[in-house]
């Protein structure tokens, strides 16, 4: 049973738990490390112990599940004291535990913010601290920043400050697009991020992208033809039916192709709500923060910008 099907039978608090569970498959890894491409990772994937963030106390870290993989420590060389070996090992474990807790808090906050977006409600810093961050208030800037980045990259949702004095925020779709795919109660994951990715690909292909190239690029983020996706549902239906019916995409046979091949173009609604320039700027902006999942698109976007397109 998919996440969206499960949510139909859940109470609000149970839906949040189910959603946060699924968000373990969201790109938290991308938001936590600029050296990684944007892929769908799991909460069990813990950054290496080379991070400069200070470790938490053992009491604070022990609340996280113990399903964490640690790097095997090398055997001490002859003559080294047990104290010398114990120090780095303990530090490494505490660091890994701390980073794992932060990663889970990011996923939890993404789930909380998605519920706020679905309800079309603003959110305050105080709400986030009380409902999600709790004992990790000192880590709020990091957790909030990474959660905001994940929302933008995966779901196409921007977190915008509405009231600086009251630390109040609103959640809106990126690039001025009015589509999010939330057409019913069973649609719990916004699809704007998927739409933006496809629009970027088409723009980079000069306005029309072969279907096979679209699927090849989508496979980089583990979105495959015929395979249900935790965030986007059935991708072929979303790509060739839903977004076409919403007039964001055109899906047509390549003229004179035999055997028949198909391609995607921007639909009239996409052309009315955004522009090639905006999506190029989006690619450059995002890839300046993390290594973009389509490096070739970033390079093409930079070339287009230099040429004044």
From Swiss-Prot:
The modification Phosphoserine is found at residue 57. GO terms for molecular function: histone deacetylase binding. Residues 45-64 are annotated as: Disordered. Keywords: Cytoplasm, Nucleus, Phosphoprotein, Transcription, Transcription regulation, Tumor antigen. One of its GO terms (biological process) is negative regulation of transcription by RNA polymerase II. One of its GO terms (cellular component) is nucleus. This is Melanoma-associated antigen 1. It comes from Homo sapiens (Human).
């Amino acid at each position: 049973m998919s996440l969206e099907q499960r949510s139909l039978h859940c109470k609000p608090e149970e839906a949040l738990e189910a959603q946060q569970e699924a968000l373990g498959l969201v790109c938290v890894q991308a938001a936590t490390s600029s050296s990684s491409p944007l892929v769908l990772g799991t909460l069990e994937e813990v950054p290496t112990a080379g991070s400069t963030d200070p470790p938490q106390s053992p009491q604070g870290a022990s609340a996280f599940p113990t399903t964490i993989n640690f790097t095997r420590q090398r055997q001490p060389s002859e003559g080294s004291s047990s104290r010398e070996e114990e120090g780095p090992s303990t530090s490494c474990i505490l660091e890994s535990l701390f980073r794992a807790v932060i990663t889970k808090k990011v996923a939890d906050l993404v789930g909380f913010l998605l519920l706020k977006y679905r309800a079309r409600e603003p959110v305050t810093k105080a709400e986030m601290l009380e409902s999600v961050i709790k004992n990790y208030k000192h880590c709020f800037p990091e957790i909030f920043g990474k959660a905001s980045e994940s929302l933008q990259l995966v779901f196409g949702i921007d977190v915008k400050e509405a009231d600086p004095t009251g630390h109040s925020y609103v959640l809106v779709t990126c690039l001025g697009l009015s589509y999010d795919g939330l057409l019913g109660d069973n649609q719990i994951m916004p699809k704007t991020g998927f739409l933006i990715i496809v629009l970027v690909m088409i723009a980079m292909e000069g306005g029309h992208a072969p279907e096979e190239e679209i699927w090849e690029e989508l496979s980089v983020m583990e979105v495959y033809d015929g395979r249900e996706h935790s965030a986007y549902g059935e991708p072929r239906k979303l790509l060739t039916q839903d977004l076409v019916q919403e007039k964001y995409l055109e899906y047509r046979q390549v003229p004179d192709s035999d055997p028949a091949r198909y391609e995607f173009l921007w639909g009239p609604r996409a052309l009315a709500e955004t522009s090639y320039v905006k999506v190029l700027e989006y690619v450059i902006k995002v890839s300046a923060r993390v290594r973009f999942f389509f490096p070739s698109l970033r390079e093409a976007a930079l070339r287009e910008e230099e040429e004044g397109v």
